[in-house]
Amino acid sequence: MKKHILYSFRRCPFAIRARWALRKSLIRVELREVDLKNKPLDLIKTSQNKTVPLLILNNGLVIEESLDIILWSLSNSNVADQKKYLPSNFENKILNLIRENDKEFKFHLDRFKYSNRFNDVNKDFHFYQAKTIIKKWNDMLEKNFKRNFWLVGENESIADWCIWPFVRQFKIACDHQNISNYFDDPMIQWLNYFETNNFYNDV
């Protein structure tokens, strides 16, 4: 049977989380790594956004947003996984956390990590704003830490999947500093879970 096709870029956090969800959902795809400076014509023709990740299903349906790819992956996994990774009683909280990451945190992360790409940007201000959000997430992890390991509820959820690649980028951008300056122990262990997971090298 014809495989689904995923256009991806290895270091892109949106693409990382899409690949993670597909891997966790045991959905096999034909992975096509993209040179962002020389995008393939098929991607340009197919995608309105003209960027990654882009999933083309074997029936021709196109899914462009990473969160939509994640939700599609879950909908095509078993019912137990759907309830585990997006439990109905925490769905709104999970989706709101993802929105906070995708809108607010990424806005400040980009202007801290890539400050030379923006005009009149105060790098330190955006670092502080990103760090404040990190602290909020760390407090959520710490609150749950004695009972479990996750941002929301008792199990790993798509909130964890969606946010950890961006926290990793923040850590990389701060690599000249001691990690304990901006991450407390729960956040360090949470991120370490993903970076040392057997799936990590696969995605």
Q: Model regions: which residues?
A:
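Alpha-helical scaffold segments in carbohydrate-active enzymes
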Residues: E100, K136, P165, Q169, ...
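Short, conserved alpha-helical segments within structured domains
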Residues: K39, F90, E154-I163, F183
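Charged/polar, low-hydrophobicity segments characteristic of intrinsically disordered regions
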Residues: R111-K113, Y193-V203
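Extended, well-ordered alpha-helical scaffold segments
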Residues: H126-I133, N181-T196
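Surface-exposed helix-capping loop/turn segments at secondary-structure junctions
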Residues: D139-G153, N198-V203
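GST superfamily/GST-like fold recognition
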Residues: L151-H176, F194
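GST-like domain detector, emphasizing the conserved glutathione-binding G-site
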Residues: M1-N138, E142-K143, N148
